[in-house]
Amino acid sequence: MKESLKERIKLWKNLYMNAFENAVNAIPNVEGVLLAYNTNIDVIKYLNKDDLERRINQIGKERVFEVIKAPTERISSLEHLFGGILRSIKLGKAIEWFVENEEIRRYLREWGWDELRIGGQAGIMANLIGGVYRIPTIVHVPQNPKLQADLFVDGPIYVPIFEGKELKLVHPKEAVKEENELIHYIYEFPRGFQVFDIQAPRENRFIANADDYNARVYMRKEFKESFEKIAKGVELAIISGLQVLKEYYSDGTTYRDVLDRVESHLNILNRYGVRSHFEFAYTPNRLVREELIGILSKFTSVGLNEVELASIVEIIGDETLAKEVLEGHVFPIIDAINLLMDETGIDRIHLHTYGYYLALTKYRSEEVRDALLFASLAAAAKAMKGNIEKIDHVKDALSVPTNERAIVFEEELEKEFTEFENGLIDMVDRQLAFVPTKIVTSPKSTVGIGDTISSSAFVSEFAMRKS
């Protein structure tokens, strides 16, 4: 080993400080970001053991426990709701099920919440990119009721509206309509949380999704009719929310109707030289997942975690590699992102997993690594605070310890790759960037951390390379 653990940690501390300064200085140079398609209201409740046990006993513990063993993956009864919550706690896994009836939706409202936040990947990123980084941001909102509009922070955040035949960009608070409240009920639990004899192996959340619009990737009239005009005003675009697509809908439409429109949007973005990032999320439907892989070549960049990567590799046809990726070792993950780049031709792949991030690019640049470091600080700030309100919150994350376990992976990479320096590996026709992340041991919230990571890395890398 070339350096002691202490020396390596000191090296990364310096790299983190430099990356923060470089990113913050460069971010004002970004002229505009477009975010589509999913925005909603996140209702957050921190689970209480006594309250949860009381509610489960009232409806019948045995029936609820049956759902843990045989998950319904949808909610049409209280047994389904609480069975889903307990399954999420038992596995320490983020689980999201759709709420199918109004009676359960009323129950969820009456159960109440601890916090209201803007939700959906596009909505969360808008408050970060526009509200904290102060970059002009245009965000798609399927509906814009007052409850949701008030959750957008002040800053250069805009939604397109028609005034007569003229397209205008205004803050969501200036575009309120009597529209549906699209609510995702999020039940958070910490590591070690115990209910009955079930204990959470790690912190996570269960989501009861009572949102009929984002479930279909509904697009507003303004986006359908004036997308080209909207695209002309931005340099970057981040697309998300496609993971919910189904093969068929009751009105006779299919996932293909949505993807055709998405592809037409991508063609416009590419025509105007707008760099686009696709935030991949686990997509249960295999056919939809296959189609999403098929359009990756139209994007500049994709962001995903190891579970999502494995689900893609399985579709590509290497089931053995997919299983190895899920085991979490760094070399199968590197093989998998190289395979994904071979298959799609995409320029940039950003993988975020617990403890470290990787970025595989077709270009060489120290800014790729610095962007990952900046994203790690943003993620740590989000975990600590629950919500990032100012850039100083990101700076405060410099004091969070760097993950020492990831240093072991760094040492293995050094042995495997001769061209390895300060987290950058020259792979002949590609560059691989590796960074150990900041780890917050008791996060206040886990919602939106992946979106914070990917958007911060994509936007700050572009800003620094542009500078």
From Swiss-Prot:
Write down the required cofactor(s): Mg(2+)
- The EC number on file is 2.7.1.-, 2.7.1.147
Q: Which InterPro entries match?
A: ADP_PFK/GK, GlkA, Ribokinase-like
Q: Record's Gene Ontology CC terms?
A: cytoplasm
Name the family the entry cites: Belongs to the ADP-dependent glucokinase family.
Function (record text): Catalyzes the ADP-dependent phosphorylation of D-glucose to D-glucose 6-phosphate and glucosamine to glucosamine 6-phosphate.
Q: What is this protein called?
A: ADP-dependent glucose/glucosamine kinase
Gene transcribed to yield this protein: glkA
